[in-house]
C-alpha cells in the first residue's frame, strides 16, 4: 500500500475525526481525484507542440492524457471550434497518492524561491487549485529534451464540505502552505 494512503488511514483519519467531531469514519474528507491540465496555446500554429506536451504530461502523471479541444471559435486567437489546444489527465486511487506524494516531497521543494503554496487557492467547496509555472520541477522531465517551458494547473478535488476541512486534510498530508 502507498505510504500516504497508509498514513491517511492510520494517522490522518483519527486526527480529523477528533478535530471536527465526526460521528462516522465516512464523514472524514479524503482526496477524491487530482486533475492535471495544461493549455498549449501555440498548438494552433504548431501541432508538434501539443505532442510534446502530451508526452511530458504522460511522463509526469504516469498515465496517458486526453487532448482537450476548443469549445468555440475565437478569431483574435486564430482559433476554430474543435481544434486541439491542450491536454489533461485525471488521477485516482493508487496513482493519485503516488503523484501527490511526489508533488509534495520532491517537486514543490524544487520550485525556485519556494515559500509554500497559497492558502487562498481553495474554491469554497473544499477543492484546491495549484498553478505550476514550469514542468521542469518534476524529476521525470529531462531538462535537455524540453522544447518549451510550459506551466500547468493541478486541481486537488476533496470530499470536504468546507475549505477549512480541506486545508486541514492537505496540511496533514504534508502540503506546505504559506505561514
UniProtKB/Swiss-Prot annotation:
The keyword tRNA-binding applies. One of its GO terms (molecular function) is tRNA binding. It comes from Bacillus cereus (strain AH187). NCBIfam families: PRK00010.1 (NF000585). SUPFAM superfamilies: RL5-like (SSF55282). The keyword Iron-sulfur does not apply. It holds the Pfam family Ribosomal_L5. Belongs to the universal ribosomal protein uL5 family. Part of the 50S ribosomal subunit; part of the 5S rRNA/L5/L18/L25 subcomplex. Contacts the 5S rRNA and the P site tRNA. Forms a bridge to the 30S subunit in the 70S ribosome. It comes from the Bacteria. This is one of the proteins that bind and probably mediate the attachment of the 5S RNA into the large ribosomal subunit, where it forms part of the central protuberance. In the 70S ribosome it contacts protein S13 of the 30S subunit (bridge B1b), connecting the 2 subunits; this bridge is implicated in subunit movement. Contacts the P site tRNA; the 5S rRNA and some of its associated proteins might help stabilize positioning of ribosome-bound tRNAs. Keywords: Ribonucleoprotein, Ribosomal protein, RNA-binding, rRNA-binding, tRNA-binding. GO terms for cellular component: ribonucleoprotein complex; ribosome. InterPro entries: Ribosomal_uL5, Ribosomal_uL5_bac-type, Ribosomal_uL5_C, Ribosomal_uL5_CS, Ribosomal_uL5_dom_sf, Ribosomal_uL5_N. This is Large ribosomal subunit protein uL5. GO terms for biological process: translation.
